[in-house]
Amino acid sequence: MADKEAAFDDAVEERVINEEYKIWKKNTPFLYDLVMTHALEWPSLTAQWLPDVTRPDGKDFSIHRLVLGTHTSDEQNHLVIASVQLPNDDAQFDASHYDSEKGEFGGFGSVSGKIEIEIKINHEGEVNRARYMPQNPCIIATKTPSSDVLVFDYTKHPSKPDPSGECNPDLRLRGHQKEGYGLSWNPNLSGNLLSASDDHTICLWDISAVPKEGKVVDAKTIFTGHTAVVEDVSWHLLHESLFGSVADDQKLMIWDTRSNNTSKPSHSVDAHTAEVNCLSFNPYSEFILATGSADKTVALWDLRNLKLKLHSFESHKDEIFQVQWSPHNETILASSGTDRRLNVWDLSKIGEEQSPEDAEDGPPELLFIHGGHTAKISDFSWNPNEPWVICSVSEDNIMQVWQMAENIYNDEDTEGGVDPEGQSS
């Protein structure tokens, strides 16, 4: 009986998801300046824009690249580099180019040829997360289903993978007992990599001091303050010795690598009422950071007074797995997770007056809801070169590259707009 009910619930949910998607698709021309939808061969659990951009002469597009991975059933997995053509601001297109069948537009009726897989490198098991090293973006670290963290220099691998399926990382980083997701390169100290794991620990490696012969590098330091799965870890963006970590013990911890006590953080705070899955430091304000949780909220923190949560962003209907500040705007951050939504928030709007109708759509600081995914969003990344462009990937193989309509973030058009979920008001 319970099975029947579960099947019925699933069918109802699927119908709701499909209906919502239809409404979203119908409204994309009003909500977006760009939407590209691409079905990957396998779902990617990870997405990160590389920092470089090519602007070919005489063309109305620029070429950007992404680091992706695969999560296959039983087939060979790969670390993937893809290229994406984004239209220039002056590219000629209008709403008549909109392809209502696919819910895509932006001068590209369809995306064929606009998103291409450039490099595939054999990987051991799915790629839980992949992140490039800021000082040398050819170097990419990956989290595997085993306890090892792998490092690849993608310039040293053929663009087509060896059919044998053999995985040949340039380095293999040891120190964990279990898999995990959190991964962070120090933006101020080249080669310093942090990793978070299900084994309750955080490992630090320095790959700049690696002997040329050995492929295996042992952790320089192991931090053991958390009492449960460590979900995410992130270096502070300005202070080379500070980093933060979050875990299933519901805590946010701030660490200083100069301290000799690797089992006690400088600060520890009960951040949420459920597991804490992600964190992000603000690139413009050295004291501000955000955390996302299974309690469905994003919390805002000030390092100068962690006892007091600055704000709680509430609108998600399920667990939050990723939070990222915009690289271009001090007050903008985005969050995503199990509810298939990516929410963009604007701190500067906290506490603004709202009409009762607007309040029904969400708090004033909820700037936009990206409703284009029909499955859990695994990861997303703000494009560092094109403001407001985001790439998001979901569990059903879909990758979307999109940019909300300018009138949404440029506030002039506030009358009779479209509510963030895409139902016209």
UniProtKB/Swiss-Prot annotation:
**Family statement:** Belongs to the WD repeat RBAP46/RBAP48/MSI1 family.
Protein's GO biological process: DNA repair; DNA replication; DNA replication-dependent chromatin assembly
According to the record's subunit comment, the protein's assembly and interactions are: Binds directly to histone H4, probably via helix 1 of the histone fold, a region that is not accessible when histone H4 is in chromatin. Forms a large corepressor complex that contains ncor1, sin3a and possibly sin3b, histone deacetylases hdac2, hdac1, rbbp4 and possibly rbbp7.
Question: Mind naming one GO cellular-component term on file for this protein?
Answer: nucleus
Q: Write down the superkingdom of origin.
A: Eukaryota
Organism the protein comes from = Xenopus tropicalis
Please list the residues that carry the modification N-acetylalanine.
Answer: A2
Q: Which Gene3D superfamilies match?
A: YVTN repeat-like/Quinoprotein amine dehydrogenase
PROSITE patterns linked to this entry: WD_REPEATS_1, WD_REPEATS_2, WD_REPEATS_REGION
Arranged from A to Z, the UniProt key words for this protein are: Acetylation, Cell cycle, Chaperone, Chromatin regulator, Chromosome, DNA damage, DNA repair, DNA replication, Nucleus, Repeat, Repressor, Telomere, Transcription, Transcription regulation, WD repeat
Task: Fetch the SUPFAM superfamilies from UniProt.
Answer: WD40 repeat-like
Signal peptide location: none
Quote the function comment for this protein.
Answer: Core histone-binding subunit that may target chromatin assembly factors, chromatin remodeling factors and histone deacetylases to their histone substrates in a manner that is regulated by nucleosomal DNA. Component of several complexes which regulate chromatin metabolism.
Fetch the PANTHER family from UniProt: WD40 REPEAT FAMILY
Places the protein is found: Nucleus; Chromosome, Telomere
Return the protein name: Histone-binding protein RBBP4
